[in-house]
């Protein structure tokens, strides 16, 4: 029998578990997969299968991440879980697993701990838009007042980092009980409550094709008699022949018109997100466009040089630097398709950054780049990746 085609009838959402070590992230991940697979089909996963997360590479950085899938009544979810704290930091900063929402797991017995705080801060910095809380190990707390206290603490912590703490869904339960097949309030019922919260609280993400048109420039050719062709992969949106576009970054922004879209040597009337295309530009000279710029819908994205970012610096073992760096360190910042030199300003309380650290920095680039909050970049020295980062806030 032929393999069934994957029918994506339900909208797709990416989520992941975050929170302090040993608060039950992996147990909860296993419990969700197990309970939901019995209700809506899919694969149950054992704790050990998730905990033995395979290595993968993102932007030259090795990260251990477990990917599982499950379905609810309304949606299909891809869920990431990481074994170690360092893996979370790397994952969130590189955007290896872009999350539409996160499930913050917090032990009711311990309350918020240092990594609870750190993961909420990271989620804020890297632009995770929604957090839902699973208050775990509630079977170990008999005192209702204590539970209330922990819930208040978590809400305060979320509000402190600009998440809507008062309106955040908090589900009380026990991942362990649910995984063991307990049908009670803290077991299976709690997992179903969590599934409902995921469905109702995290909005369906915009598909790439519905975004405003953006294509990073990879190469530029001039074709005699036809003009200038720019090639690249469309990141989001749709480009139609005859539409006005802007060329943004590196130099002053220019306006032009798309007079043709080519794919696999065929002429099309439009290109869309995910397509590798050549775009023919009217009246644009070859030397007006270069790798590192973007083509975009006019007015949709601006060039910037000054921003704050959250970065992870590779350890020596990962092929990174062997020595720390200090204020005013000047590496290259690799955005989309090109390197731009920039200088790094460290936070007041930070004298230096060691390989393996993550830190908030302020960057000034020597040339402007088409930039939005949430844009990922690599930090390089002579073509070698020494770090990864994400734009947290644009200054100018």
UniProtKB/Swiss-Prot annotation:
Residues 136-139 are annotated as: G4. Residues 10-206 form the tr-type G domain. The keyword GTP-binding applies. Mg(2+) binds at residue 26. It catalyses: GTP + H2O = GDP + phosphate + H(+). Residues 81-84 are annotated as: G3. It is an enzyme of class 3 (hydrolase). It is found in: Cytoplasm. Residues 60-64 are annotated as: G2. GO terms for molecular function: GTP binding; GTPase activity; guanosine tetraphosphate binding; translation elongation factor activity. The keyword Cytoplasm applies. Keywords: Cytoplasm, Elongation factor, GTP-binding, Hydrolase, Magnesium, Metal-binding, Nucleotide-binding, Protein biosynthesis. Disulfide bonds: none annotated. GTP binds at residues 19-26, 81-85, 136-139. Its EC number is 3.6.5.3. Its main location: cytoplasm. GO terms for cellular component: cytoplasm. Residues 19-26 are annotated as: G1. InterPro entries: EF-Tu_GTP-bd, EF-Tu_GTPase, EFTu-like_2, EFTU_2, G_TR_CS, P-loop_NTPase, Small_GTP-bd, T_Tr_GTP-bd_dom. Belongs to the TRAFAC class translation factor GTPase superfamily. Classic translation factor GTPase family. EF-Tu/EF-1A subfamily. GTP hydrolase that promotes the GTP-dependent binding of aminoacyl-tRNA to the A-site of ribosomes during protein biosynthesis. PANTHER family: ELONGATION FACTOR TU, MITOCHONDRIAL, ELONGATION FACTOR TU-RELATED. Monomer. This is Elongation factor Tu. It comes from Ralstonia nicotianae (strain ATCC BAA-1114 / GMI1000) (Ralstonia solanacearum). The gene is tufA.
């Amino acid at each position: 029998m032929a393999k069934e085609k994957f029918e994506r009838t339900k909208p797709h959402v990416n989520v992941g578990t975050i929170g302090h070590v040993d608060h039950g992230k992996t147990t909860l991940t296993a419990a969700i997969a197990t309970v939901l697979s019995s209700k809506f089909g899919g694969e149950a996963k054992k704790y050990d299968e998730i905990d033995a997360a395979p290595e993968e590479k993102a932007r030259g950085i090795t990260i251990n991440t477990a990917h599982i899938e499950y379905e609810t009544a309304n949606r299909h979810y891809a869920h990431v879980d990481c074994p170690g704290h360092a893996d979370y930091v790397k994952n969130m900063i590189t955007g290896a697993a872009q999350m539409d929402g996160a499930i913050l797991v917090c032990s009711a017995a311990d309350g918020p701990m240092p990594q609870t705080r750190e993961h909420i801060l990271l989620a804020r910095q890297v632009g995770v838009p929604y957090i839902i809380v699973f208050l775990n190990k509630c079977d170990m707390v008999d005192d209702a007042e204590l539970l209330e206290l922990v819930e208040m603490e978590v809400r305060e912590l979320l509000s402190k980092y600009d998440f809507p703490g008062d309106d955040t869904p908090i589900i009380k339960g026990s991942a362990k009980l649910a995984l063991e097949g307990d049908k009670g309030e803290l077991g299976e019922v709690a997992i179903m409550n969590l599934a409902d919260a995921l469905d109702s609280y995290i909005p369906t993400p915009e598909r790439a094709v519905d975004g405003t048109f953006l294509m990073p420039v990879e190469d530029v050719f001039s074709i005699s008699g036809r003009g200038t062709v720019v090639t690249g992969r469309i990141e989001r949106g749709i480009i139609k022949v005859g539409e006005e576009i802007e060329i943004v970054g590196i130099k002053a922004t220019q306006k032009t018109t798309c007079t043709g879209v080519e794919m696999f040597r065929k002429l099309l009337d439009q290109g869309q997100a995910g397509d590798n295309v050549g775009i023919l530009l009217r009246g644009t000279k070859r030397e007006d466009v270069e790798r590192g710029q973007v083509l975009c819908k006019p007015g949709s994205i601006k060039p910037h040089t000054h921003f704050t970012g959250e970065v992870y610096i590779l350890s020596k073992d990962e092929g990174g630097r062997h020595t720390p760096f200090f204020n005013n360190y000047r590496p290259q910042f690799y955005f989309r398709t090109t390197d731009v030199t920039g200088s790094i300003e460290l936070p007041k309380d930070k004298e230096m950054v060691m390989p393996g650290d993550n830190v908030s920095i302020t960057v000034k680039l020597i040339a402007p780049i088409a930039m939005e909050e949430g844009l990922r970049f690599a930090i390089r020295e002579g073509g070698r990746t020494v770090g990864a980062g994400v734009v947290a806030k644009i200054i100018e």
